[in-house]
Amino acid sequence: MIQVLLVIICLAVFPFQGSSKTLKSGNVNDYEVVNPGTVTGLPKGAVEEKHEPMKGNTLQKFPLCTTGPCCRQCKLKPAGTTCWKTSRTSHYCTGKSCDCPSYPGNG
C-alpha cells in the first residue's frame, strides 16, 4: 500500500519528464511533449532553420543588429565611423554596439 502511495505521489509531482524517440529518418530526438506522435522528422543529419538568410536589407541567419545609427544591413559599422555630428563635436561607433555613444535617441 505504501509503495502504491509513493508511486501516485511521484507521478503527481513528476508527471512527465520527456523521452527519446527514434524517428523514421534514424535521428534520435530528446524532447518534452505530451503527444510524441505529433513530432515531425527531418532527413538524417538535417537541421531545422529558425531564421531566414539575409538578402540585401532583409534578415540574416543571426543578425548582429537590426536598427540604430551604428547598424547597416544587419551588421555593425566599423569602429570610428561617424554616427552623430553636432556643430561642436562628432560621435563615433564603437564597433561593438548598434547604438551611438551619447546619441540623444539612446536616452
From Swiss-Prot:
A GO term for molecular function = toxin activity
Q: Give every Disintegrin domain span.
A: 65-105
Ranges spanned by the short sequence motif Cell attachment site, renumbered to the chain: 85-87
The reply to whether Secreted figures as a keyword in the UniProt entry is: yes
Which compartment or compartments is the protein found in? Secreted
The record's keywords, sorted A to Z, are:
Angiogenesis, Cell adhesion impairing toxin, Developmental protein, Differentiation, Disulfide bond, Secreted, Signal, Toxin
Similarity comment text for this entry? Belongs to the disintegrin family. Short disintegrin subfamily.
Question: Oligomeric state and partners?
Answer: Monomer.
Annotated protein name in UniProt: Disintegrin lebestatin
